[in-house]
Amino acid sequence: MESPDEKWFRERLRHFLEIRHPPRQFHHVMIERRSRLAFESYAQSVELGVPAASAVRAADKVLFRGLLFSKYDTVHLILTTDFPAIPENQRQEIALRLVRICAPIFRAYDLKDDFSERPEFRQLKEELRTGIRSWIDENGVPGYHSPARKEKPPVPYSEHPRYPKRNKRK
């Protein structure tokens, strides 16, 4: 294994945030601080004689602390499993919007790194499913037809308004 440096930790964190916490991927100060602290943790561990793989695991705890549970991931997973007809290229944008819309639901829970392993996680997912389904039924999603959404039926062509023909200029 190549010996990690601060840049290595920075790139790992940046990639992790891009996938699991898209809004945080541009928090450069946080990324710099965490990658520096993770590298320092790694270097101290190696200096004490800890094997490199164990030193990386210790540094990862510093690098990813407080980031292991992802609201975005949870919402995106629900969209993927419960609404597979929503086009893939729209899911990220919709998930980002729904994370903000579902903020009151998330606030009711103590979301720590191990939250997805606790029994309350199942309850959170059910509340989110209900909230997301309700939002989609009310607002719609381009490219996805919700069975519960009351959409106006398309107007037959014969009933379209007729516009008078324009006089051609000579």
Question: Which residues make up each language-model segment?
Answer:
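C-terminal alpha-helical interaction appendages
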Residues: 1-170
